[in-house]
Design a protein with these regions (language model features):
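Subtilisin-like serine protease catalytic core
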Residues: 161, 226-309, 319-322, 333-336, ...
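Substrate-binding/access-modulating region of protease and related hydrolase catalytic domains
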Residues: 157-162, 189, 238-239, 284-289, ...
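Autoinhibitory N-terminal propeptides
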Residues: 18-236, 240-243
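Beta-strand-rich modules
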Residues: 776-796
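Catalytic-core environment of secreted peptidases
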Residues: 246-259, 393-445
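C-terminal subdomain of the subtilisin-like protease fold in secreted/lumenal serine endopeptidases
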Residues: 291, 302, 456-532, 550, ...
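Pro/Thr/Ser/Gly-rich low-complexity, intrinsically disordered linker/stalk tracts
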Residues: 722-748, 781, 796-813
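Hydrolase catalytic cores
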Residues: 280, 419-486, 612
Length: 851
């Protein structure tokens, strides 16, 4: 019933569109506007008369129009138009605007013509519809009984109370405010009557309901290389960075979160999804070191999704949130919704903020992009924003997961933005456990955690100052490891995150900020030395939020060209044509008028001063700030795990990871057990590989070194690596009122042990011992205490800590030399008459020394 009814309604819509105005008969080719509902050619402004007012408009205080011209209007033009009573309510592609006029008369028309406006139209009812409503793609979730739940917007000054009679006549139920508009319930057959009201500017289906969408991840993302285990190295663990995490209800007790959840603003728990995601972001590995997250120094504010987004205006300042993480869907290929506009606006109002989303788990779905199953199925909505990060899911071997959602965004922009490990991610499960889970839900927190580390890196290298979110997005994407097709693509985005390369760009100050206005040109010099193997450059800008009616989300279009002497290059551009061949094709060099990021890459670039020419091609909302960041990759190889200083268990298979530019030679992998005096080759890897495995030798020591080489390029671990086992069979022997005793199996050839107890936030080392037992003193027997132990190498390096053990409250097996016990109760007896007054009844007991 409902489906056939919708078809009937939409047929009426399209007939209505044709009857309202025959746009193609009044074509002004310079006056074209691209909206969600379609592309419209506007009538010439010279044809506009007072007769064009419809009856419902004649008594309005303001009039809504769409105008267009051959180029964007300048700020000076808008100043003059404002004086004439004409307000800009938002940019529309191409060179068009949604405006309100205080008066519609000959003076108004003359003022618009003077500024170059050539086309003008009433905002017709069909122009106000979202793409889904206009294309008869109405999701089931908007039905509430026999009505649709919709979101509507009106004039900026609209008083919704003044529309009560209008709503009553259409039997519309007003549900309440949301974003810049209100939520309503309306019968489907009355939607076009609603759209005809002159004060209504936009109508969309309600936002889609939210659906939830590390051991290896830390190495793959190069997160480990940002917080090395040897003295004097990088220590970017996210210290002081606050992440706003929205998920599935109350985060449950887990010692990996101890002391670092600043606020828990969620309701009752609805599952383990949030616990797992939180652990990937900031888990300390207190229970199990293998469960450590990307940024164990960061802190968390936890919410019910989407309150981490809804509350950011307050909590950006209150808690200092700089990164958010949301692993929830928001409709499949939902387009540029009111929620999308909201998160784009957040990046403008809170310049140091970065929203991170999962790309979605609908990789095999058909979400009506037009290319069939497998393309255009990003699950949002908000994750299709221009100023946010959407994360794809790759396996431990850097292969895109089949379930990971593909781009493009609804208007052809590059999505996802980046990829991270989301397959078999090992992270927290309440209470005090772990589990491996797969999905872009698990990839999103990997990016949020690495971003927390990079924010920390920026602060440490810039006197504690915060970076802008636009810079962090550019650093993250420009320094990713390219996977899949060469250059960006609609599966991996710009590639799998490489936190180390991004941190180096921060340390080298390989970035610059500037602003540009309409038709301005800037030139930025980038010197490239001899011997470079790869040059990467990215231009990125935090683009103004789009008008929700717009068919293309980009507002300000910056175009860049790279030059060296007589040679020039354009940025990489993808083909968004809705067929699988085009969408899966390699990027080509071309002018980009869709994205607010433009990337240039050159292999084996000639040395010299490259000139990046930045042009303000179309800046209707300017001047526009932008970032340029670049990375120069030399002919080097670099081991990223093990990086040096680690202590590994013997006879254990470990991953090896390294970075290197593209090349043709194989990699040679070697190890030394004598501090580098001699090496033994254990593997070769093809030129395309950046990972391998190794089984650590048997025994204990302090002198394990790895070496990797390709041709003349070689790298060693930065510090010797230790070898020692970790204690097993941790036992509580006894617990008394002020102490408890523990023991463990001895570790072969260990020089001693470090004993740990859970402190306020982390497992703190409390003592060392050469025994395989230890007594903790000055302990409150009523407290729960977590403890663990690690072995020491002969050189005193601390090995892997054993999985922590919980000592529960109470006494156990306590033998005391002086122990007072109550052996019996002498009075009162156990036979007390009901009528006896017990108020002053004497009590007598027999006490004995039970020691």
């Amino acid at each position: 019933m409902k489906k056939s009814y919708i078809l009937l309604f939409l047929c009426f819509c399209f007939v209505s569109q044709a009857q309202n105005i025959n746009l193609e008969n009044k074509v002004n080719k310079k006056s074209r506007v691209i909206l969600q509902s379609g592309t419209y050619s506007l009538p010439s402004i010279s044809e506009i008369t007072m007769k064009s007012l419809n009856n419902t408009e004649r008594n309005q205080e303001k009039f809504i129009r769409v105008i267009s011209g051959p180029s964007p209007l300048s700020p000076e033009s808008w100043q003059r138009l404002n004086k004439a009573g004409i307000e800009n309510n938002g940019y529309l592609p191409i060179n068009s605007y949604l405006i309100t006029l205080s008066n519609l008369n000959s003076k108004t028309i003359i003022a618009l013509k003077k500024e170059g406006v050539t086309g003008m139209s009433v905002l017709m009812p069909e122009m106000k519809l979202s793409k889904q409503l206009a294309n008869n793609n109405v999701p089931d979730y908007i039905w509430v009984g026999n009505k649709w739940e919709l979101y509507i917007e009106g004039l900026p000054s609209i008083d919704w109370n003044r529309l009560q009679n209008f709503f009553k006549n259409l039997e519309i139920d007003l549900l309440g405010p949301q974003f810049e508009g209100v939520r309503i319930l309306i019968s489907p057959e009355k939607v076009m009557d609603l759209a005809k009201h002159p004060m209504i500017t936009y109508i969309q289906q309600k936002e889609a309901p939210a659906i939830p969408e590390n051991k290896i991840g830390i190495k793959n993302h190069r997160s480990n290389a940002l917080r090395v285990p040897y003295a004097g190295g990088r220590n970017y663990d996210g210290d002081g960075i606050v992440v706003g995490h929205g998920d599935d209800g109350d985060i449950q007790p887990h010692i990996d979160f101890s002391g670092r959840v600043l606020a828990n603003k969620s309701g009752p728990s609805n599952g383990a999804h949030g616990d797992h995601v939180a652990g990937t972001i900031m888990g300390a590995g207190n229970l199990d070191p293998d469960g450590e997250g990307q940024a164990p120094g960061s802190k968390l504010v936890y919410y019910d999704y989407p309150d981490n987004l809804n509350d950011i205006d307050t909590d950006y300042g209150l808690y200092g949130i700089r990164v958010t993480a949301s692993s929830y869907s928001n409709g499949c290929n939902a387009g540029y919704t009111s929620f999308t506009r909201r998160v784009d606006l957040d990046a403008i109002q809170h310049p140091s903020l970065t929203h991170v989303f999962s790309a979605g788990n609908n990789g095999n779905s058909n979400c009506n992009y037009g290319a069939g199953s497998g393309w255009g199925n990003i699950t949002g909505g908000h994750k299709q924003g221009k100023n946010v990060i959407a994360t794809a899911n790759v396996t431990g071997s850097d292969i895109i997961a089949g379930s990971s959602s593909r781009g493009p965004a609804h208007d052809g922009r590059i999505k996802p933005d980046i990829a991270a490990l989301g397959t078999n991610v090992f992270s927290c499960l309440a209470p005090n456990d772990y589990r491996s889970i797969t999905g872009t839900s698990m990839a999103c927190p990997g990016i949020a955690g690495v971003l927390a580390q990079l924010y920390d890196a920026y602060r440490q290298n810039n006197n504690g100052a915060d970076p802008e979110g636009g810079l962090m997005r550019a650093l993250l994407t420009n320094n990713a490891d390219d996977l899949g097709n060469p250059g960006p693509d609609f599966k991996y985005g710009y590639g799998r995150v490489n936190g180390l390369r991004a941190a180096k760009a921060i340390e080298m100050n390989w970035f610059i900020k500037d602003t540009i206005a309409q038709n301005e040109t800037d030139t930025i010099d980038i010197p490239v030395p001899s011997g470079a193997e790869e040059l990467r450059i990215m231009v990125h800008w935090t683009d103004p939020q789009a008008t929700v009616n717009a068919g293309r989300a980009l507002v300000n279009d910056i175009n860049a060209t790279l030059k060296l002497n007589a040679s020039s290059w354009l940025p990489w551009v993808l083909n968004p044509t809705p067929n699988s061949t085009a969408l899966n094709s390699n990027a080509v060099r071309a002018v980009d008028s869709l994205n607010n990021s433009e990337q240039f890459t050159l292999g084996q670039p000639n040395n010299g001063d490259y000139k990046l020419i930045i042009n303000g091609s179309s800046i209707p909302s300017g001047p526009q700030g932008y970032w340029v960041t670049w990375t120069i990759i030399n002919d080097e190889v670099e081991l990223t795990y093990p990086i040096g200083g680690e202590v590994l268990p013997p006879l254990t298979t470990i991953p090896l990871r390294w970075d290197a530019p593209n090349g043709t030679g194989n990699f040679s992998l070697e190890f030394s057990s004598n501090g580098g005096n001699s090496f033994t080759q254990f593997a070769t890897a093809p030129s395309s590989s950046r990972q391998s495995t190794f089984q650590t030798p048997n025994g204990v020591g302090d002198s394990l070194v790895f070496r990797i080489s390709r041709g003349s390029a070689t790298d060693l671990t930065d510090a010797p690596i230790g070898l020692v086992g970790y204690p097993a069979n941790l036992q509580l022997n006894w617990a008394c009122p002020d102490s408890f005793n523990v023991s463990w199996n001895s570790v072969s050839n260990a020089s001693g042990y470090v004993v740990y107890m859970l402190g306020q936030e982390y497992m703190d080392a409390v003592d060392t011992t050469t025994n395989n037992s230890y007594t903790f003193y000055n302990i409150n027997p009523s407290n729960t205490i977590w403890w663990s132990v690690a072995a020491l190498t002969p050189g005193g390096k601390v090995g892997k800590r054993a999985v922590a053990v919980e000592k529960t409250p109470g006494l156990q097996g306590c033998l005391l030399t002086n122990d007072v016990i109550i052996s019996s109760i002498l009075s009162p007896s156990n036979n007390i008459p009901d009528c006896q007054n017990t108020g002053n009844l004497p009590v007598s007991i027999l006490i004995e020394n039970g020691g």
